[in-house]
Amino acid sequence: YTAPGDGDNVKLSRLGGSDWAKTRKKVKAATEQMAKELIELYARRKQAHGYAFPADDTWQGDFEQRFAYEETPDQLTCAADIKHDMEEPWPMDRLLCGDVGVGKTEVALRAAFKCVMCGKQCAILAPTTILAWQHFNTALTRMESFPIRIGLLSRYRTAKEQKETLRGLKDGTVDIVVGTHRLLSGDVKFKDLG
């Protein structure tokens, strides 16, 4: 396999030849090193203590009942699994994936709601500016009846608006921030990220 643009860098070796053996040995060593690092990382994560969120309360039930659509069984399962993970005293390690339109945003918003109603802050990272804007507007609509402040960090915001959001994250007056990779910038500081 070669990636696009790698055509000039491809070198073929004879199977069983010395070049092949050297390449194979290097790849094996690199793979073993990567596996060792992953095992060490997961061991550290298992020993790390995180914040254990309390069980769902009436606010959570009210928020979830206000969803305008009927949840799919998979949505309900995913939301329950994620909230269960949040109630454990160690960092969560979970990836939620699915096709467009299957309800991932609602599952994420339920977790975000649980997070902020317990006094923590939440960051929602989106891969594109348009998706960040959509998530921001969906969150505003879904949470308009609750005491939650939501900010957006993306190129759609003026410098002044971004400064206000950054200040709110640092002092705790912004509960949820939605954004692109901008959220990973060094100037983004949270008061108490959950």
Residue ranges and their predicted role:
Residues 75, 100, 128, 178:
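Conserved hydrophobic/aromatic pocket- or pore-lining residues that grip, position, or stack substrates
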